[in-house]
Amino acid sequence: MLFKSVLLSTLIAVQALAENSAHQEIVTVTKTTHISNPCLENYAKKLLPNNPTGLTTGIPIVIVYAPQQPDNQVKQSESLQPTQSSKAQQQQQIQGSSVPASIHDTPTPTDHTKITVTSTTICNQKVCTVKTFSTIISHSESPTTTTTTKQNEEKSIADTKSFTHKALPSSNGAVTLKTTSVKTALTTTSTVFSATSLPSTTYTPSTSVSLVSTTKKNPVSSQSVVSTTKTISINTSLITDAVTITKEATTLPNSKHSSIFTNGSISFISTSANKVKSTVTSDISNNSQNGSSLSLTSTINQLASITNSTLTTITKPTSLVPDFSYTNSSRVSSTMRNSSEESSMVLEKSSSKLLSSTSFLNSSSIASTTESSELASATTSDSSLNHSSSSSVELSSSLSSEADSSSSSESVETGSSDETASNYSGDLFKAIDTNAPPTVFARSEIPLTIPAGVDNNGKPIGTNKFYTNLLLGNQDFMVYPLPYGLYWSKTSYYGFAVQHNNVSDRVFGSINTNNKGVASYYFNPTNNAELIFSATSFSKDSMHMKVSQMAELSALVTLSSSSNDESNYLDIPLVQGMGFVTGIYNGNLTPLLNSLFGVKDLSLETSDALLSNVLKYRATLLNNVQWLIYVTLPDKDTDFKLEVEDFYNLKGSKPVDGLIIQVAIAPEDNDNDKYYDAAAGMYVTGATVSGSVSQGTAASYKFSYTTAGKSSSNNPIVFALPHHMDSLTGSALDALTGITVTSTTKGEMTGFLTNELEFSETINQDVEFLPWTENMTGSLTYTKDQLELLASAANKELAANIAATVKNMNSNYFSGKVLDKYAQILLVVSEIIQDEEVTKDALNAMKDAFKVFTQNKQYYPLMYDTKFGGVTSTSAQDGDPNADFGSAYYNDHDFHYGYFIHAAAIVGYVDKKLGGTWAQSNKDWVNSLVRDASNPSADDTYFPVSRMFDWFSGHSWATGLFVTYKNIESSSESLHFAAAIKLWGKVVGDQSMEARGGLMISIMARSFNMYFYYKSDNTVEPKQILPNKVSGIFFENKVDYTTFFGTPADHPEYVHGIHMLPITPSSSLVRKTSYVQEEWKDQIAGFIDNVDSGWTGILRLNQALFDPKSSYEFFASNNWDDKWLDNGQSRTWSLAFAAGALNAS
């Protein structure tokens, strides 16, 4: 009876809708929706609300009921990762008078994501509108059931506007998305050509592999340092107790706040309209009852006039009462303890408002500065602190406004925002600077010839972009805007070739590996021209290519018969994520489509769902792969058609100025043609990246596609990568098509009918300079014994002439690593050991070392390249582009510069806490490195936008101007760059840069764990390579478990360690505990005992991310040997990192 009631209710609803129009009929198609018996009635009521039971319409309805199945047997009808099967031949036939039925497709197995589709079709005569709900279930989660909403009355022409709503998450990880309305209609198929016999020979793709050369220099080195004798060192005997470091203790002074007090130090800032001289005396009574009362007397004499003001009493907020813990050679340090006592501040009013606000932040000295039209500097004298009790201390200091401009006690405002980093809201892509780079970078050109026809209209040219191969050599290497691969075909057939990627075509192999029986690589065959955009006038001797409009995510290829033909040309826009490959024929070109494989069948498909000026063809190649070909005419033209000349040539019947030809691999399910139909005629011409952040943590970014042409949906079709799907938001949530296309090395891409893809991410603000792992639950704490060992290691490692050491290194990569190593030692001395005297000595040494580079006196000075627009190495000016790791030709810039920027951030941070302005004084030089590798805005015309980081791919491409496929060998050094600009932005007050670095880290956390780091449950990469645990070199079209400097057969530590170094607080944001532990267990544990070099320390510090106890024991061993350290790694930092992680876990 229950089943009968549901059936009757269904019939009632159909009749009610049918009566709205004499010609309108409703067809509801539900694909493989599994529901249990108890919910059947509720399900029907949701579909047909407000309809009484028992009413009969007489219209036959078929309801297919599937009994409840075990969870592991429930399968979905469509998949975001379909297997590669032959295309269905049956065309969709929807007619108003047909009997609707529930269609159950053959289940498709999937590893990554499943999709179930429930669709409702509204038909009027020949034209139907399909509304669809799609449920995406990531990572093989259990499916959920989705339902249609009440249908709006539709006219025969589909309403194509999108419906804005957020994703609907469920408890099992599914997200329900709604597609844009699209039209479908009766499709009539007519055969244009069908082969009755096959050619005697057919094209077979090459599966030969090109081995990676492993002759590059090892990036881990143990070059000797220039030693020196230090007169100042940490007195370990004065370390008497443990230390705990709070977040407040590492907060930088903010120039918009005027008073600073932490760790027993005071920085007092007064505000005036003019320069002033200041004298401040302070006294904290030993008899203070609550430990938080502070008396200050301040007399300020203005230059032009005198204004007296007395600060009579400040009672410090008791949540920041110093809790003194230990002494060392130069100061009494403190940490902050909580108290419930209240605070108050009493100020005597004066004619000038001298204090705007009070805050208590971390400082290591007493400083006095004045905000005015010009900033006056102040010099801090040494402070004497006598530890009397936990709540009282005597302190006196004298401050003078006379200061050396280079003194570490200078204090000046940096940054332009009134907001602190923690609550910054605004643009993520503000220009860093729009002025020319400093003149210290000599103007010159790298000795690389740009081919004729490459012209970016005076704008900087991206050197690490997907289109770079079109600028190099013979210009015939493939490019991968994704999901398709393309190349300039200059032999046999002449034009621009297109190929798709098929899982079944991947080539796996194993060579020079430590994992016997496991594939060490896979790749996709190249230069397989399934279709070639050409024209009858193109030939070997009469074809010219131009490359122009090169931007962050796009470029334009133009083919013509000669370089001076400005009237007859073929434009092919290349845009990352483009759903069609599009050719626009201009002038008197007769279109020609070639195929290396050959065409077996060509059919014309007509439908009222297509625009009247659009022709749709389906071409089946001799390899049984089907392609959709859409021809859009400027006006409806009944005379134009595609004709088959032979197996390998499809020719347009005549030239048409403005003709558009678009091709796409046909969907696995022919029913999904409707989305390509809805997008046909519109194509993407470019894309930009924009984004914003709210309150410092909630970030969003989006790809906005520019379009040309017209489609029935008023939208183009674009594709997103797997790492995009989990963070997708905005209007794209309503634009899912269910179409998937296989990428080269990044799994399945998903199609959307939209001109905008928007994503949301959360920025982690807790991770900054000091040690952090995701397992740390407590405060950063160090025992007395650990501090003594840290101090001993620091004393030994700081006995070096840092400037002399880095000056003579024959690579900016190595010198940058060494500079960063000493910066981290400085950080430990300043923040953990807290020895002020040694901190100042090390800080001055670091400043001297930086002068080598800011004055451009290193082994390979830097220059500004006026040809491509960038700050790059002069190492190739003598003819060797491979010197300095190829840096001159823009290889590894983020790796190299990340070390300098990170070191500068630490130096600036420590110096700023001491009241100095080193960061401000050197900001232009450091920012030039940031701008070169990561310029965020086209407003900065001296550098290309985002040279290294590919916002679409979710990671950087290291390879610069070398004829090969884009690749990245060290994911961790790319991460280090993002962390560096985040910290540098924090130090100089550039909140946009700081947040942008944080966003890059969040994006990499997604992409790295899908494409580079392989847990056993990874569902994006092929299962054949997962036991390797790491990608090795990740190319655009290949994953190769090796390195450029050695193979895992001999040195497995190379391929694993290059994705670890350097270990910093940001490492654990990306290298998740579960992954690191699995990699160690399955791989590293098997060879770690055989590693006896600088790689040992890298692997062991990585161990701290999941096993800090063993890591610390290694670095604290009595049998310690410095040979286990790379030049870029110190024992001091390694001990601090491992101990901090151990004690707080």
Curated annotation (Swiss-Prot):
Record-linked PROSITE patterns: GH81 (PS52008)
Signal sequence interval, chain numbering: 1-18
Residues the record lists as binding (1,3-beta-D-glucosyl)n: 896, 969, 973, 1054
EC number: 3.2.1.39
Annotated segments matching region Disordered: 73-113, 325-345, 378-421
Region (May provide specificity for triple-helical beta-glucan): 1038-1040
Positions annotated as active site in the UniProt record: 892, 969, 973
Induction context: Expression is decreased during the hyphal transition, in biofilm, as well as by heat stress, caspofungin, fluconazole, and alpha pheromone. Transcription is also regulated by ACE2 and SIT4.
Effect of disrupting the coding gene: Leads to clusters of growing cells that have not completed separation.
Residues of the GH81 domain: 426-1145
Region (alpha/beta subdomain): 668-762
Positions glycosylated per UniProt: 235, 263, 286, 290, 308, 328, 338, 362, 386, 423, 502, 775
An example molecular function term from Gene Ontology annotations: endo-1,3(4)-beta-glucanase activity
Catalyzed reactions per annotation: Hydrolysis of (1->3)-beta-D-glucosidic linkages in (1->3)-beta-D-glucans
Region ((alpha/beta)6 barrel subdomain): 777-1145
Location in or out of the cell: Secreted, Cell wall
Family: Belongs to the glycosyl hydrolase 81 family.
Protein name: Glucan endo-1,3-beta-D-glucosidase 1
The gene coding this protein: ENG1
